Amino acid sequence: MSLTRRRFLQTSLPLAAAPLLAAKPSRTIGVQLYTVRGTLMKDSDHILKTIAAIGYKEIEGAGRSDLIALIPKINDLGMKVISCHVETPLITGDWEKYKNLKPVPLEEAIESLKKAGLAYFTMAYIQPQARGGDLDFYRMTADRMNHAAELCHKAGLQFAYHNHAFEFAGKEGERPIDIFHDRLDKKLVALEMDVFWVSVAGNDPIEMLKKWKGRVGLLHLKDKAKDAPVQYSESVPPAEFKEVGSGVLDFPAILKAAPAAGVKHYFVEQDQTSGDPLDSLKKSFDYLQTV
């Protein structure tokens, strides 16, 4: 063997083997600020600095006015605000069922997030007192989401809907989540899929990612305790919420399936934790760096 050929093989073989040592996917992890709702506005400097120091790069707000006030601080820390959970009656129009909220025109709310530089306008939840008793309510709600999504699209925002567990409860042989799947405009409405609530309702997050292929723009990450019962209420005992990687959900498989579903942004949201929410966020972030 010539010296030249020997050198070629010595240098090329490690390169040929490199694909076998595939790098972990590049994945930017964010925080849903609902996790730190109890102290955020009282000590925002400390909380946001800690979130940034942990390594989080993206933020999702849990309310428009508070988030907009915090955006300069968030930007100064090198993080980017991507999405915000907005007032449900902006979309549904039933302000009388939300006594603690001041009515605001939908167009005004859209403009506020557009002006603030966000990409997503996200409907987070339909409170129990506002849910109709039959499936026609969900058909009507889907139509109203489509309308809001059209206005968002014209303004340069993406409309999204965040699921919980109640959408998976069967009624009249059909489920609200199936109505949303079939009735929401595929081009205008993205799903913000919460893997915890999908699983709490007895469904497989991976199968749901496949069913909603190309339509899941955002993913909420939190883990579930072993032996947690199937239920369709959000009244879940705090102990059933676990940090990512500390429960029974198959996060390596979920994260592998996410890109094909259309996921662009990943947010850790810890609704309940027995300790310091910031410690909880660090635990989840550290685990996510390993998968």
Residue ranges of predicted features:
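N-terminal secretory signal peptides and thylakoid transit peptides that target proteins
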Residues: 1-16
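Boundary/entry segment of secreted carbohydrate-active catalytic domains
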Residues: 24-42
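Hydrophobic faces of well-ordered beta-strands that scaffold small-molecule active sites
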Residues: 27-32, 59-61, 81-86, 121-123, ...
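Active-site beta-loop-alpha junctions enriched in small/polar residues
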Residues: 34-36, 62-64, 86-89, 126-128, ...
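Short, acidic/polar
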Residues: 39-50, 101-112, 202-208, 251
